Amino acid sequence: MLTADLVTTRRRGDELRLVPVDARRRAHIEALAARFSGIARAHVGSTREQLDDALDEGAAATDQPNAERRLVAAVQKLVHDGCSFEEPDADAAAALRRDIFRRAAAGRRAASPSAPFDRAALLEVAAGERATTAAEIEAGLYADRPARQRLQAFAGRPPAALAAGFELAEAQAVLLRATRVTASVRARDAGTYRQLFRTLKFLRLLPTIAAAEDGGYTIGLDGPLSLFQGSTRYGLQLGLALPAIAACDTWSIAAEVRWGADRRPLRFRVAGGAVALSASEAPALPDELAAFVAAFERLDSDWRIDQAPAVLDLPGAGVCVPDLAFIRARDGARVHFELLGFWSRETVWRRIELVRAGLPHRILFAVSKGLRVGEAVLDETPTAALYVFARVIAAKQVLDRIERLAAA
């Protein structure tokens, strides 16, 4: 993923714009990607330091004018993202250093003019004890240092695909500095919406979803700390949401960003058609929700869990996207479930207002005790309920509540 400093932009008043990628620029990006990809493939088995040096030499050899150096660095970064490095045992490396340094200290103390300290001999002895070579011992001394990690594989995107997705990669980097994003999306396949909404929840973003007149949705996105004006702490999540948004048939984004060294507030807009950056699966459930699902499925009950999120729309009031639904085997009764556990009180009250406006679905909301919202606020609504939990979601308590809702 690109960082904000690698994006080539222009300012027009209070608007931030990307430099357009025309045919000439796209061909240039593809050529750079091909050059850097070739270097990466040739260095499989080399250290990260050796690869980085070779990539830097390759960049210098392109002899680009100053205005193009940022583009070169951006392509280099995207190619580097396709590299997989070994993850050495840090404890083993530290233990090896202690042993070799202890031996070296003892050897230097015992050395004399007639019998000087012999580093090579020390490494050979240590290697013999470990049934390896002196070269392997020396390489292992600092194997836990990033520069010494070895490139295991290169699985970067084809140069043409990297060039085709370059503008989207730049837009993703701009969103690292976003404080708020409004997206308009439209897709023919309901599964695209489900994957998008699940991705937003997985990223701990707070989507405000409304049905649009064209059959799509308008989505407002804030991070959980958006109440602190100007915070870009959740810019990474906003950036990571872009591929799921761009998978829709048509989409557009309007963002408020803080840009430059002075963090000047600017507006940023980008739009397009369906773009597949890479093959991806639907994101996994958050850990706390996955743990609950596992616990619930161990219960002896008549209910099964459907993990394909539904889109519950109350025209004129808003949209709710539960995390999952419980379905009773004997009669097909369905109760939706949404975890609002550690989000904001504002999000919880939005759901309460949606229910009070007449949401025509049975639904249970699980809310963290820390949000200070009482279960009684929905006592007079027979088709919806709040379940307040302290640390973990108790499967038996949820079962009791969905049984009551199903009976309503």
List each model region and its residues.
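Electrostatic, structured charged patches in enzyme active sites and in nucleic-acid/phosphate-binding
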Residues: 1-408
